[in-house]
A protein has these predicted regions:
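C-terminal alpha-helical "lid" subdomain
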Residues: 116, 146, 159, 166, ...
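Conserved AAA+ ATPase "SRH/arginine-finger" region at the nucleotide-binding site
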Residues: 66-67, 160-161, 172-186
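Walker A/P-loop nucleotide-binding motif
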Residues: 27-48
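Conserved NTP-binding/hydrolysis module of P-loop NTPases
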Residues: 71-90
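Short regulatory helix/loop adjacent to the ATP-binding pocket of P-loop NTPases
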Residues: 50-53, 157-172
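A short hydrophobic beta-strand->loop->alpha-helix junction that borders the nucleotide-binding pocket
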Residues: 62-71
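Conserved Walker B catalytic segment
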Residues: 102-105, 109-152, 156-162
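A short, basic N-terminal segment
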Residues: 1-29, 249
Length: 253
């Protein structure tokens, strides 16, 4: 299921994460790590972060990595070279690092750009690539970091962090995205229905039905969206007046 920032509901945990992450980036803190289980909304948060900076027409330039599966450090550096649109034919790690550093210096001081690398699915990163990222974070002047990195990852990323204390110590902002509670789940459902254009006077779910949705999905946003999609299809096809607890229980079976 593709993330859709338009339907974002600023629940307490997601809203706090997004706001704190934005502040940390604007303060040029360096390394940021957001951890959460599958379906907790990490990818949506990454897209919202991009939208928020673009909205203000800022001098930040974001580079997005969706699938960090590289065989080795050279492959990772070659990927970054292409991502940063650096023209070069070298396969030397030292040369690639020097070229990337030159790009970051040029972007910062000649083009007045703050470079941010966003990595989704960060749990796929290998140990040797963690060291590359740590080296990139060393590129700084007395008062300016030449690159900031935001990693969105599943909980197993913590195991990799334990193996790299020097990298872990660099984390300026860390946040764990939790599933929604029952109250936020109900707000999440109501918000998405409103954004979809539902008349405020129209009720699609009973309160008991929404409580059962929470019980079934355990507050994971992706599961809530998929489950409610099935419920609404049932509601339309069967010509129901409202989605009640009986309809939800039937779908849960």
């Amino acid at each position: 299921m593709a993330p859709d920032p338009e339907f974002f509901c600023a629940t307490q945990t997601h809203g706090e994460c997004l706001n704190r992450l934005e502040i940390s980036l604007r303060l040029n803190r360096g390394l940021h790590v957001v951890i959460g289980d599958i379906g907790t909304g990490k990818t949506t948060l990454s897209r919202l972060l991009l939208e928020r900076f673009l909205m203000y027409g800022s001098n930040y330039e974001f580079f997005l990595v969706l699938d960090p599966t590289w065989e080795n450090s050279i492959d990772f550096l070659q990927f970054l070279k292409k991502l940063f649109r650096i023209e070069s034919n070298t396969n030397s790690q030292v040369d690639l690092m020097n070229q990337i550093e030159h790009f970051l210096l040029d972007s910062t001081f000649n083009n007045n750009k703050r470079i941010v690398l966003i990595i989704d699915e960060g749990q796929k990163i290998r140990s040797d690539q963690i060291e590359i990222i740590r080296t990139l974070l060393n590129f700084e002047t007395n008062n300016v970091k030449l690159i900031q990195v935001v990693i969105f990852a599943q909980p197993e990323f913590k195991e990799l962090l334990q193996l790299h204390e020097n990298f872990k110590d660099r984390i300026a902002f860390g946040f764990t995205v939790q599933p929604l509670g029952e109250k936020n789940t109900i707000e999440f459902i109501d918000h998405r229905l409103k954004v979809a254009g539902l008349d405020e006077d129209k009720k699609v779910f009973t309160e008991k039905a929404k409580a059962l949705v929470y019980k079934h999905t355990k507050g994971y946003p992706r599961k809530i969206v998929v489950f409610c999609h099935h419920l609404i299809i049932d509601y339309i096809i069967n010509g129901e007046e409202i989605i009640n607890s009986e309809i939800v229980l039937t779908r849960m079976q």
